Amino acid sequence: MKVWVCGPAIWMMPSESIYGGWPASGEIDLVEIRGDNMQEILSTVHYGSDPANHKYQGGTYLLSQSNNLNEVFHELAFIWEENSMKFILDNEYTVFELTSSQIGFEENYPFNEIFYLIVNVAVGGNFVGNYVNNNDLCYAANASNCPDNKRFLIDWIKYETL
């Protein structure tokens, strides 16, 4: 088996698919990291009537080399209000903001429903683009012999109603 790269993510899916299956009821990607690119933070929302009509809007924030995801903890705030959402990094930088009218929803806006939080690390896939460092790949049959230098550390998660 060959394991390529890890992609940490914090995202949200609807508790109920009120408007139909993915992406009709929405998906909110609070933060996604592409493989070894520790300077790029992606935030995205997914929507559309069905997979063939999948649409998304998102933002990217580039960190400096000295402030990258390997060096320091970062705080991501997600301000979620009726018909709008905002992604803020380190209480200072707006990564992305969106309103229902920006994406053409006058009614049936899926992001006003209840969503649940997912914290995961994806292994493999095609999302990582060209951010794979081949020196980090483990080709050993027994993966326990490989150096384990990848981590997805979360200091805290806080949820509050404003």
PLM feature spans:
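GH16 jelly-roll
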Residues: 1-162
